[in-house]
Amino acid sequence: KVYGRCELAAAMKRLGLDNYRGYSLGNWVCAAKFESNFNTHATNRNTDGSTDYGILQINSRWWCNDGRTPGSRNLCHISCSALLSSDITASVNCAKKIVSDRNGMNAWVAWRNRCKGTDVNAWIRGCRL
């Protein structure tokens, strides 16, 4: 599923991401835009053999199990395929675990490069939340 911007913002808010660990909703919507273009089915292979899955491009080396990443830690205790669902609950729950780590949202390269230090509230402007 490809979410609309405000549709995704509403879903993320409902699932408790707004100001989770101090990151406003705009940060999460911005990260999803530049990680997956709001597409829950997005997958991208990395040079180390791991793969990033779903709307927030969660990595199989650390966070989920795809059965083909050597030494996967599966810290979210989830199958990577669950992160491709049109229902983003599994992705959000895993993202909460990731952002609680010491790096916070810096774990997402696209957030670090495209969202950090910008006016992320623009991503939720005009949305009825």
From Swiss-Prot:
What other facts are recorded?
Lysozyme C is capable of both hydrolysis and transglycosylation; it also shows a slight esterase activity. It acts rapidly on both peptide-substituted and unsubstituted peptidoglycan, and slowly on chitin oligosaccharides.
List the GO biological process terms.
Answer: defense response to Gram-negative bacterium; defense response to Gram-positive bacterium; killing of cells of another organism
Extent of the signal sequence: none
In Swiss-Prot or TrEMBL terms, this protein is called Lysozyme C
Concerning Pfam families, the annotation shows: Lys
Q: Cite the EC number.
A: 3.2.1.17
Originating organism: Syrmaticus reevesii (Reeves's pheasant)
Using the chain's own numbering, where are the disulfide bonds?
6-127, 30-115, 64-80, 76-94
Q: Where is the C-type lysozyme domain?
A: 1-129
Annotated TM spans: none
Q: Which PROSITE patterns match?
A: GLYCOSYL_HYDROL_F22_1, GLYCOSYL_HYDROL_F22_2
Q: What EC class is this?
A: hydrolase
Q: What interactions and quaternary structure are annotated?
A: Monomer.
